[in-house]
């Protein structure tokens, strides 16, 4: 599994990113802009809650009948001259794609943005096979040029970089001579990429939605790079998660409308591309050969469980853009290509609790993510369910938490210990108290009091106050 992007543990990653003041400022600013645009776009559409309910209904229906629609998709792709491969694991998907590359004697591959190819670590496999792989999405291209810096956001992978940093990367790696103006940076990237499109042997894309009734794939972009990736190379390979499918064009229209408004606050992105198999005889562009790789990689294990709603995700990152935890720690702290609330739910399911057991706790459970989700995934409830699984089934609760709960249980079950504790606590905590607040808690309380106010216990216990008033004191 190549979802993991950093070998450091969760607490080390968080500590590093909490001190990255630029990153935190960039994330906060981006969240504000994207959230505001989303609200404006939703209001303009009208009946937003009805649209959300329809999106949820479409995704739930598709998942409940996923085997049927995948078979229909496969048959229709084959009817139109395409090749379909169902990959149960990342290794199977990578091996199939590598074999196609070897068969075609391909040396250069251009790619449009694809989270699932990041998930299976496809680029590294193809580079090991002797291929040059070029990312053509501008954000992904910037990260690739910058020594394969991992993405920090599902929609805007280079969110953690500013224009000055990008300018410096381009100057160091690409011989860039101009300023940090975004227009000049984009034009330079365009100039560098144009040659790559024209000389590529294979184009690889992701898939926003596959359409079962026609065997088509839908690509949603703002840069037009996916059109060039699919139009110019002779061979096209599309890689999709098995859940990224809709029954018909009608459902696709609904989900695209929800996606573009939720992701970037637009009615539609600049390009909505629908492709159906290889080129027909007489066509002047498009691939001569088309391969569709449908990736499971743990998704089938989620079907039929309490976590199935996470597969409704349309990768809009609306949940990321409202998350207060993501706002402070950024995407790299999650240690996964999937960050934010959706990453905190999905990463343990696909990558396992050993690597991602901390992520469900990286949430205030404020439910802002659930309210923002255009297909109504109950993200905060799924995070809570993860915590339950970690504690009850995996036995992953921290030792400090186990000891604290045992101590509380012991004290709460004994009236003598409870009374003693309530008497002793104010005096015992006096060394840590400042202005009626515990400013530096002992032991496990330290992590809490570093970032939150913790009121000191009152010196007068309620039971003493109550007893005094029962004697006929103040009424």
From Swiss-Prot:
[4Fe-4S] cluster 2 binds at residues 323, 366, 369. It comes from the Bacteria. [4Fe-4S] cluster 1 binds at residues 313, 316, 319, 373. Residues 304-334, 353-382 form the 4Fe-4S ferredoxin-type domain. Keywords: 4Fe-4S, Electron transport, Iron, Iron-sulfur, Metal-binding, Repeat, Transport. Belongs to the LutB/YkgF family. Is involved in L-lactate degradation and allows cells to grow with lactate as the sole carbon source. Has probably a role as an electron transporter during oxidation of L-lactate. This is Lactate utilization protein B. It comes from Geobacillus sp. (strain WCH70). The gene is lutB.
């Amino acid at each position: 599994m190549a979802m993991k992007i950093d070998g450091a543990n969760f607490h080390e990653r968080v500590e590093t990113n909490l001190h990255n003041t630029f990153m935190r400022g960039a994330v906060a600013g981006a969240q504000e802009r994207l959230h505001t645009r989303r609200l404006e776009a939703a209001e303009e559409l009208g009946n937003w809650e009805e649209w959300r309910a329809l999106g949820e209904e479409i995704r739930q229906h598709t998942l409940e009948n996923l085997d049927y629609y995948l078979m229909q998709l496969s048959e229709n792709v084959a009817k139109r001259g395409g090749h379909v491969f169902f990959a149960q694991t990342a290794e199977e998907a990578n091996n199939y794609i590598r074999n196609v590359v070897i068969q075609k004697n391909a040396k250069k591959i251009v790619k449009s943005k694809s989270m699932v190819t990041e998930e299976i670590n496809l680029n590294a496999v193809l580079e090991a096979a002797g291929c040059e792989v070029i990312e053509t999405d501008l954000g992904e291209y910037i990260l690739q040029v910058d020594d394969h810096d991992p993405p920090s956001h599902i929609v805007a992978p280079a969110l953690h970089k500013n224009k000055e940093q990008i300018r410096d990367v381009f100057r160091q790696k690409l011989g860039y001579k101009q300023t940090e103006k975004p227009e000049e940076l984009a034009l330079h990237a365009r100039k560098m990429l144009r040659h790559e499109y024209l000389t590529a042997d294979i184009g690889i894309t992701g898939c926003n939605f596959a359409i079962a009734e026609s065997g088509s794939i839908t690509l949603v972009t703002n840069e037009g790079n996916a059109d060039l990736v699919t139009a110019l190379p002779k061979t096209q390979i599309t890689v999709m998660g098995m859940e990224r499918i809709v029954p018909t064009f009608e459902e696709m229209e609904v989900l695209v409308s929800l996606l573009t408004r939720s992701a970037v606050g637009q009615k539609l992105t600049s390009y909505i591309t629908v492709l159906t198999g290889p080129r027909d005889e007489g066509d002047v562009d498009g691939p001569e050969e088309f391969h569709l790789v449908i990736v499971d990689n743990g998704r089938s294990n989620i079907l039929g469980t309490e976590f199935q709603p996470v597969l409704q995700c349309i990768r809009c990152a609306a949940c990321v853009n409202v998350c207060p935890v993501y706002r402070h720690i950024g995407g790299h702290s999650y240690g996964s290509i999937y960050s934010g609330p959706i990453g905190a739910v999905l990463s343990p399911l696909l990558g396992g609790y050993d690597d991602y057991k901390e992520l469900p706790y990286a949430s205030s459970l404020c439910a802002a993510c659930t309210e923002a989700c255009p297909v109504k995934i109950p993200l905060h409830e799924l995070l809570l369910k993860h915590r339950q699984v970690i504690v009850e089934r995996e036995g992953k609760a921290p030792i400090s938490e186990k000891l604290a709960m045992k101590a509380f249980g012991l004290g709460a079950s004994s009236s003598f210990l409870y009374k003693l504790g309530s008497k002793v606590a104010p005096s015992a905590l006096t060394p840590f108290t400042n202005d009626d607040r515990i400013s530096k808690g002992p032991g496990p309380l330290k992590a809490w009091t570093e970032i939150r106010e913790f009121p000191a216990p009152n010196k007068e216990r309620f039971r003493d106050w109550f007893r005094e008033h029962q004697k006929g004191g103040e009424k």
